[in-house]
Amino acid sequence: MRLTLLGLTVAAVLLSQVPAAWAEEPPLEPGFVSIFNGKDMDGWDGNPDFWSVKDGVIRGETTAEKPTKGNTFCVWRGGTLKDFILRIKFRLQNGNSGIQYRSKEMDKWRVGGYQAEVENAPGKVGFLYHEGGRGWLVNVGDFMVIDEKGEKKVVGKVWDKDDLVKRGYYNNKDWNEYIIIARGNFIQHYLNGYPTMSLIDNDRVTDPKDPADRKGAAMEGILALQIHAGPPMVVEFKDICLKTLEGPFGKAVRLFNGENLDGWVPASDALKETFGVKDGVITDTGKPAGYLRTADDFTSYVLSLQLKHVTGGNSGVLVRCVGPDKVWPKSIECQGQTNAMGDIWNIDKFPMKVAEDRTNDRHTRKMHPPNERAMGEWNDYDILLNGGDLQIRVNNLLQNTATECEVVPGKIALQAEGSQKEFRNIVLVPIGAEAAAKPEPAK
């Protein structure tokens, strides 16, 4: 028994070093479509000298006898990508590769545009490159904003790069999974469950119909896989699944500037010392109970943020918060309690429809077991409100949904509820009619 307990303890420690959602293969949420059949190149178009299907995977290969004179690409012919989530696995034996999206075909099998980097180089794999355009864009670990003049500024971190390398976020010469999310001008990369970069691209939008116009942001384009010119190489891809997202999505807004609480209001004077800013994050002591809310109202949007449990206990993110400020305002609470992220609490009878089999009174449990990261690590919280529909994702796993939510402008609030939390990288991407009217681009 003692040996068994020791083994379980060691296993638990090891599992705590990886994102909980990835200890096992996470389920694919509804709406994903496989775009590679695992049998042949149907729907894909690349130079047959280099691209083929072998053992159920797309294989790109160059040899000393058969090199490529320049970068060459295998293009998905199923249409163009605008707003989407892409999940794709890759294995690189040697050389350099990439996954192109919102890209342009400049010539036959020659592509330019956003590229998720693929190379056997921890600390580099996961960054964002602009092939045939603006070049290197966002380093691993960075949250970048590009302004209207094309000037780049790192405004925060999605994860510490050195810590990613230490954790082994990349599996050298083995299978890895990218998740690439593009909504409006907000782009995110995840590798094996870890966030590797975020970008708000406020650069001028290029003409999607002009292959030569590549020095700017791209809102749509093709998907392709790269073989890089150079020494002989082998790269493989499989399990390619795409989910098209309903928009339109507007310009992303940073609700928290990383420096002060401009744009935020404590619910009462008693909370003035509860919330603060330190090292680019919003700190929350948890006491007294209450919340910090936005000064502005929002209706339909994606809210993307990172939340850290400094101590175990309760908190939450309130959306469509309406009425007078009080400890429990009428709203939808996206739970922030330790091991309960993804749960829904209905506060003050907010009109909405939830899954009856997971609901007890005002509380709707999440769909899957907890998938939060270890205490003291950042969790990615993604809350979508589009009209009456609500979706809550924790570390890229869809954990809860609701329908027929009352469509009303409301505040967004961060709760103080007895435990210490931190919040950062709070980004709002407006949806639908609100997308055309939403405010200043992110600074």
Feature locations, PLM:
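Bacterial N-terminal signal peptides
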Residues: 6-17
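Carbohydrate-interacting regions of secretory-pathway proteins
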Residues: 22-443
